[in-house]
Amino acid sequence: MGNTSSERAALERHGGHKTPRRDSSGGTKDGDRPKILMDSPEDADLFHSEEIKAPEKEEFLAWQRDLEVNDKAPAQARPTVFRWTGGGKEVYLSGSFNNWSKLPLTRSHNNFVAILDLPEGEHQYKFFVDGQWTHDPSEPIVTSQLGTVNNIIQVKKTDFEVFDALMVDSQKCSDVSELSSSPPGPYHQEPYVCKPEERFRAPPILPPHLLQVILNKDTGISCDPALLPEPNHVMLNHLYALSIKDGVMVLSATHRYKKKYVTTLLYKPI
C-alpha cells in the first residue's frame, strides 16, 4: 500500500520519475520489456540480401558511369559565321564562347565577317564597333536581368546534316577514285608490247541500230509515200551509201531541225 520512505527518497532524487520495478527474475514488466532481435532464417536472408544483389548493383554503377562519361563528352564543334553589316572602321566580336574577349572581324567589302568553330548549344554575343558595344537588331536577341541586350544564336546538329552527308559522300567518292585509279598488281617501267593477234584484229562490227536505215523500209499504205517515218535519234548525222546499181551510187544523210527531220539524197554516177 503506497510507497515506502526509501522509495519516496529515490523518487525525489530522480526528479519525480519512478523507475520500473523488476520482478524476482530480474526482468521488467511486459509493457516495458525491450525488443530483442532473435536469430532466424529470415534474418540470414536479410543480412545476405546485399551479397545476392551485388551483380545487379555493379551493372547499375557501370551504367551510371557510362552515362556520366557521355554527359561529359564535348559536343562537336560546328563552323558558325558571324557577320556585321552596320558599317564601321574596327569591329570586334565578343561572346560567351570566348569568355567575352574581343575577337577582331575580317573586313569583306562593306561587311565584317568571322567564322568560328562553336560547340552545339546556345551562345550569346555582342559587337564592339568603333569603341561602342552594340548588338545586331536583325538577329535574335535576349535581355538579361540587368537590362543588357545580347544577340543569341543556337548551334544545332540538324543544321549541319546536309554538310555531314556531303562529307560522307565525298569520302566514299575519294575511296572509289583511289581504287579505280590504282588497280592492284605490280608496277614496272617496261612499255606495253602489243601482241600479234591484237595488231591484225578485225574492225568492230557495225552497231545493229545503224542497220535500220529508213530508206530501206517499206512505207505503209496508209502513209504518205512522200514522207518517211520518224527516224531513231542514233541515225542522225550519219552518211549512208546504197549498193551501186546501174552505175549509180546513192548517198543519204538525215538531220534534225527543231522538231522536223530532213533526209537528203545524193545520186552520183559511177
Swiss-Prot record:
Basic and acidic residues composition-biased segments: 21-36
Family: Belongs to the 5'-AMP-activated protein kinase beta subunit family.
Modified residues (Phosphothreonine): 4, 19, 148
Protein name listed in UniProt: 5'-AMP-activated protein kinase subunit beta-1
Region Disordered: start-end pairs: 1-46
Gene3D superfamilies documented for this protein: 6.20.250.60, Immunoglobulins
Residue segments, region Glycogen-binding domain: 68-163
Phosphoserine sites (modified residues): 5-6, 24-25, 40, 96, 101, 108, 182
InterPro entries named in the record: AMPK1_CBM, ASC_dom, ASC_dom_sf, CRP1_MDG1_kinase, Ig-like_fold, Ig_E-set
